[in-house]
C-alpha cells in the first residue's frame, strides 16, 4: 500500500524524553508538597487560606505557560545557526517578562484586599497577611522563565530536571523543620528560598552556555 516502516529506537526515545516527563511530574508536586506537610501542623482554616493564595498565585502566572509554548519553538529555530539573534530575542523577552512580573506583583500587593474580597469573599481577607510573600514568588517565577526555556532549547533539560528535584527535596526537608514553628509563614519562606535557588541554577547554566546575563537593555528597541 505504499507504506514505509520507519525504524524507531524506543530506548533512545525514552531516554531523551524522560527528563521532560520527570520535570512535569515534579513540577506538579512542587507547589503542593507544602500543603501536605501543613495539614499535619495547622488548622483546616489555615489550609484553606494557604490554598486560596496558591490558586491565586497560579492564576497570576498562567501567562508563563503560554509564553513557554510560543517562545521555545521560536528560540529553538535560532539555536543552531543564529546565536546572536537568539541572544537578542531572549534578552528582549527576559526584560519584558521580568517587568511584567514586577507589575503583576505590585498590582497584587496594592489591590490585595479588593482582589481577595472580589474573588474569595470577606471570609478570606486574612489572606492579605500573606500576599507580600505570594507576590514575591510570582515575581520569582516570572524571573526564571526565560532562563529555564534557554536550558530546554540548549539540550540542557536534565539540568532543569535536577534543579527541580533538588529544590523539591529542599522544600520537603526545610518544611519539616520550619512549618511546626512558623506555620504558613514558614511554608512561604521555604518556597521563596526554593525559587531563588532554582533561578540561580537556571541563571548560572544559561550564562555558562551563552556568556550573557540576558539583561542588555540595548536590545530592547
In which residue ranges do the predicted regions lie?
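Interhelical loop/hinge segments that connect adjacent transmembrane helices in multipass membrane
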Residues: 1-31, 74, 78-85, 210-221
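Helix-loop junctions and terminal segments of transmembrane helices
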Residues: 57-82, 150-153
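Interfacial segments at transmembrane-helix termini and the short loops linking adjacent helices
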Residues: 44, 84, 110-139, 185
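Residue-level recognition of pore/gate-forming positions within transmembrane alpha-helices
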Residues: 28, 55-58, 138, 164-169, ...
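Membrane-interface helix-loop junctions in multi-pass transport and translocation proteins
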Residues: 168-200, 207, 212
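Membrane-interface junctions at transmembrane-helix termini in multi-pass inner-membrane proteins
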Residues: 135-165, 206
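Alpha-helical transmembrane segments of polytopic membrane transporters and translocases
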Residues: 18-19, 34-36, 48-64, 96
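Interfacial transmembrane-helix starts/ends
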Residues: 14, 83-99, 103-111, 128-131
Amino acid at each position: 500500500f505504499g507504506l514505509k516502516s520507519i525504524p524507531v529506537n524506543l530506548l533512545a526515545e525514552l531516554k531523551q524524553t524522560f527528563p521532560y516527563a520527570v520535570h512535569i511530574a515534579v513540577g506538579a508536586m512542587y507547589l503542593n508538597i507544602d500543603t501536605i506537610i501543613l495539614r499535619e501542623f495547622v488548622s483546616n482554616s489555615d489550609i484553606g487560606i494557604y490554598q486560596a493564595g496558591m490558586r491565586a498565585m497560579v492564576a497570576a502566572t498562567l501567562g508563563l505557560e503560554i509564553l513557554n509554548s510560543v517562545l521555545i519553538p521560536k528560540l529553538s529555530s535560532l539555536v543552531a545557526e543564529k546565536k546572536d539573534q537568539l541572544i537578542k530575542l531572549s534578552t528582549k523577552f527576559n526584560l519584558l517578562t521580568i517587568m511584567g512580573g514586577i507589575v503583576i506583583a505590585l498590582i497584587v500587593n496594592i489591590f490585595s484586599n479588593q482582589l481577595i474580597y472580589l474573588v474569595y469573599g470577606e471570609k478570606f481577607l486574612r489572606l492579605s497577611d500573606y500576599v507580600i510573600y505570594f507576590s514575591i514568588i510570582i515575581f520569582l517565577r516570572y524571573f526564571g522563565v526565560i532562563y529555564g526555556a534557554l536550558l530546554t532549547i540548549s539540550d540542557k533539560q536534565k539540568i532543569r530536571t535536577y534543579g527541580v528535584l533538588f529544590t523539591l527535596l529542599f522544600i520537603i526537608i526545610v518544611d519539616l523543620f520550619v512549618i511546626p514553628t512558623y506555620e504558613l509563614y514558614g511554608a512561604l519562606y521555604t518556597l521563596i528560598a526554593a525559587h531563588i535557588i532554582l533561578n540561580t541554577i537556571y541563571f548560572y547554566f544559561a550564562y555558562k552556555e551563552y556568556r550573557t546575563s540576558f539583561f542588555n537593555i540595548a536590545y530592547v528597541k
